[in-house]
Amino acid sequence: EIIYADTLEEDVKRRDFTVNGMAMNRYKEVIDLVGGRRDIKHKVLRTIGNPAERFQEDALRLFRACRFIAKLDFLPDKALLEAMPKAFHRVSGLSLERVRNELDRLLLEPAVAKGLDVLVQSRLAECSCRVVENGEIKEVPILPELYHLVGLPQEKAFHEFDGWYHTLVVVSETEPDLTLRWGALLHDVAKGMPTIRQVINGRYTDRGHDNLGAEMAYDLLIRLGYNKKFASRVSWIVKNHMRFHFFVQNEEADEKKWMRKEIRSGEFRDSQSMREAWLQLAKVCAADVLGCGKPYSVTDGTLAFGECMADLSLEMPVHTKDLNYDKRVIEACGDNVAKGLKYLMQQVQNGVVNNTPDD
């Protein structure tokens, strides 16, 4: 049952945050009964009334708080932060769709690091929401994989920050695009895991975090209801970010060999999708460099290598439709056109012939 408010004061008191509780009359005069102007001036996110009550009324407000912090570049009010855990038990009643929508919106906001930091450090990310499958309610963990990065030490020779702060910087340095932001958020998700973290001669190492992280990223995104195509692309970025750095730093490395390997992996359906993936990987890797405390000038080589791989991907066919061949090839194949084109594609991929009609 919807009960309508009789007065403006009664109406605004039902709202979530003071910045959303202001009104304007027909004379375009702002009416502020909840201190919204004050909080905008001081860049503070505060609930209207008792924060524990506001969050109990609708647990989605917990996620909205994180998003508004990221959207407005505000700091959370102390009372708001203290009240959040008191409503965590209500998160289990939220639908996955509503939670995922808030996460996506948060990831696209300008001060994304601030919102993510509250989401994770408050332990809200470790809560579970729900989804109905085949008539049954299924519990869905939200983002419990992230908290172990908080305070995770990293080797000082390569990293200026701990695992979580590094991740926040990397996310912040990517464009507001979901593929890039998720790739950045999860690129080091496996660091510090028991099977990954080692201390060798007094130095931290996380060899293999890219491969395990790719598996974790895919499983996490599928669990949250993203489609396989999106999850696969983010997973591919996570899996290849360390190899990409290696190639940038080693000019003698054979990038064509790597390209052929990726083409044969079956990950991509056409050259254009592969080109897009290389550019996305380069952007995440450039942000990764910045997240290590390096200046922007250091990313020039990273982005240039990404352009190189993107251009190279257009030269190598991913599918037979990407082949540039003379019509006489079809005539020569006779009744075995499919097999003939597949063989020709493999020859081009292996560098035996060029992808031109003359060859």
Task: Describe the predicted segments one by one.
Residues 1-359:
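Catalytic cores of the polymerase beta-like nucleotidyltransferase superfamily
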